[in-house]
Each structure stands twice: as C-alpha cells, then as structure tokens.
A protein has these predicted regions:
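Multi-pass alpha-helical transporter architecture, strongest
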Residues: 142-171
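Short amphipathic helix-loop junctions that connect adjacent transmembrane helices
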Residues: 1-17
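Helix-terminus/helix-capping segments at the ends of transmembrane helices and short amphipathic helices
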Residues: 2, 96-104
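C-terminal transmembrane helical hairpin of 12-TM major facilitator-type secondary transporters
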Residues: 47-95
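A late C-terminal transmembrane helix in Major Facilitator Superfamily
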Residues: 102, 106-136
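Transmembrane alpha-helical cores of Major Facilitator Superfamily
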Residues: 19-27, 54, 82, 113-121, ...
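Hydrophobic/small/kink-forming positions within alpha-helical transmembrane segments
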Residues: 30-31, 61, 124-125
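Helix-to-loop junctions at the C-terminal end of transmembrane segments
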Residues: 31-48, 134-135
Length: 171
C-alpha cells in the first residue's frame, strides 16, 4: 500500500495508509468479527465453517486486483481493504471457536492457551516470510501465491469438519 507504483505498490501517503489500514481496515475487521460471532451463535460452527473458510480466502483477491490495476482512488483502495478485513474478521471467528470447542474438558484452560499460541504462530510465521517473498517475486506474483496457498485453508477446513464429526460421534 505504501510502496510507489514504480515498485508495484499504490504509493499511499502515511495519512492515507493510516486511514485505510488504521480506520477502514479496523472497522471492517470489527464488523466481520461481530457478524461471524452472530452467525455461529445462531447457526453453529458446523453450518458456518465453509462460508467462514471461504471468507478468509476469497477476499485476498482484492489485493491481487489492487496489484494489477494500481488504483489511485483512495475510495477504491479503502473499499478493497474493508472487504478483505470483513472477510478476515468473519472467518477468523471460526478459527477461534474451533479451538475453544476442541479443547473442552480436563485442563481446558491450558489447552486453550496452547491453541491460541499456535494460532498466533500460524499468523506470525507466514507474516515474517511474506515480506521476503514479496520482494523476491513482486506484488502480483506474491498475491497469486497467496491465493494458491488458500488450498491449505480448504484442507484445514476439511480436517476440522472431520474432527468435529468424530467428536460428535464420541458423545
């Protein structure tokens, strides 16, 4: 978002970046989280697991769009970031709720803490590697790689559904 167009970025000023990431993005993330929590509360995690997994992956295409068209309109950039963050917030609720549901029982607080640590690690490790990868391949190729790596989310969703069904069968 900050890199200049000559480097494949959008060239946002610090003020524009603050507005897009710090205000619009946070609002989208919060809205997505609220909608995700309400969805699970009313329909259960099994019903919403696939839509939430897809909401984590499909909005990544907004960054691919931005890398191809390099819009200079702050409204378009803000809208793309907002949509991606709503999807992320909505989908991330499934991640949190799955861990909470999976660790019930004896020593559940210790297991929940460990689960949250792995959750943080699953975010930090790719984030640490992403800057290096983006510099090596450029923004467009990087976002194509991000979309292709979404297959891992689909595989994790399948495994989560299998785990939930197995846990229900034991009850």
């Amino acid at each position: 978002l900050i890199d200049g167009a000559h480097r494949g970025g959008l060239g946002l000023s610090p003020q524009e970046y603050g507005l897009v990431a710090g205000t619009i993005g946070v609002a989208g993330l919060s809205l997505g989280g609220i909608l995700g929590a309400k969805a699970i509360a009313h329909g259960g995690i099994k019903r919403w697991l696939w839509p939430m997994a897809l909401s984590l992956t499909i909005p990544n295409a907004t960054y691919l769009y931005l890398s191809y068209y390099l819009p200079d309109n702050i409204f378009i950039v803000g809208l793309c970031v907002f949509l991606e963050q709503v999807g992320y917030g909505f989908g991330f609720v499934a991640y949190i709720m799955f861990i909470k549901r999976f660790v019930m029982g004896y020593l559940h607080k210790a297991h929940l803490t460990l689960g949250k640590a792995f959750m943080a690690l699953s975010i930090m490790l790719p984030a640490m590697f992403s800057g290096f990868l983006q510099q090596a391949v450029g923004y467009r190729t990087f976002f194509i790689i991000v979309l292709c790596s979404s297959v891992a989310t689909i595989i994790a969703t399948i495994l989560a559904i299998i785990t939930l069904k197995a846990k229900e069968a034991r009850k």
